[in-house]
């Protein structure tokens, strides 16, 4: 049996499920896009090609293996986008929680069933139907849990709203020992620059007590300010709207000292290095066109 352990975003990583970019299927129809950024690229004819995204994901696999991380990959399902494993499930402490994802993504969970089979079945949690939480909205910080959500009555109208208040409450009940903080995120079905698809599109802790943050991803300025006070202004790297659009907050930590980042994130990578971190740069700009980056395409199972 695999003993899961995830308590934060930065402890030394030992095992992870990395998505796969092979056989993602034809470019989706414009009206079938799940998010505004993919739609933008479908329309412009710049939607990523399979060979490019396969190369990008291989670069990440190489970095993970260089640090002796055990890397699981989903079983290949032909013509299915299986890049973003973070959406389909997530781990809190020693629990593996399956997300209630869009129905046509069920096959993605089946493709990692061989991994789930290695986990104690009592630790594998299925959520009730009206409880929506995706891994990109769940950020762990030891005793604290940060959860991105959308509070509006019009939640069902937003294909970009992936976590609801039922989701926040359900997690709160499941983990009574954690301090759960929720954040109301800005959503747009049509304009990627005004859309925080998940919490990790506008916030992520890195290193020792530092964080990357994008102010306008939060609908309530008080919630944004709470985060600033929690980490301390001097420990925060504020990103611009363009950097948010390019997915700067969606890097992925192997440890407090090692971060995998996109090679074009010049300003962020400089800041990470100035703060004592080793930055492993990879090309990920094609995958970013689907409104997801490094954190979105990883599902950590075990950290120290």
Predicted regions and their residues:
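The feature marks the mature, well-folded catalytic cores of soluble enzymes
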Residues: 1-304
């Amino acid at each position: 049996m695999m003993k899961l352990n995830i308590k934060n975003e930065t402890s030394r990583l030992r095992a992870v499920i990395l998505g796969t970019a092979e056989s993602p299927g034809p470019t989706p129809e414009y009206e079938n896009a799940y998010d505004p950024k993919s739609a933008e690229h479908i329309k412009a004819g710049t939607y990523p090609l399979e060979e490019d995204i396969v190369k990008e994901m291989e670069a990440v696999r190489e970095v993970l293996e260089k640090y002796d991380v055990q890397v699981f990959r989903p079983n290949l399902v032909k013509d299915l986008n299986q890049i973003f494993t973070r959406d389909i499930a997530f781990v809190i402490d020693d629990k593996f929680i399956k997300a209630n994802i869009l129905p046509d993504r069920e096959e993605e969970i089946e493709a990692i069933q061989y991994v789930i089979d290695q986990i104690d079945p009592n630790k594998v949690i299925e959520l009730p139907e009206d409880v929506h939480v995706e891994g990109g909205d769940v950020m762990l910080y030891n005793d604290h849990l940060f959860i991105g959500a959308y509070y509006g009555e019009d939640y069902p109208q937003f294909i970009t709203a992936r976590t609801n208040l039922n989701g926040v409450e359900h997690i709160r009940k499941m983990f009574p020992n954690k301090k759960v903080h929720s954040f109301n995120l800005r959503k747009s079905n049509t304009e990627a620059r005004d859309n925080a698809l998940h919490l990790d599109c506008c916030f992520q802790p890195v290193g020792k007590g530092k964080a990357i943050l994008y102010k306008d991803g939060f609908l309530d300025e008080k919630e944004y300010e709470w985060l600033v006070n929690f980490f301390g202004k001097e420990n925060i790297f504020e990103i611009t709207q363009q950097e948010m659009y390019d997915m700067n907050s969606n890097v992925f930590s192997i440890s407090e000292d090692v971060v995998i980042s996109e090679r074009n994130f010049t300003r962020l990578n400089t800041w990470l290095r100035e703060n004592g971190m080793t930055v492993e740069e990879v090309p990920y700009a094609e995958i970013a066109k689907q409104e997801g980056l490094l954190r979105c395409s990883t599902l950590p199972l075990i950290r120290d």
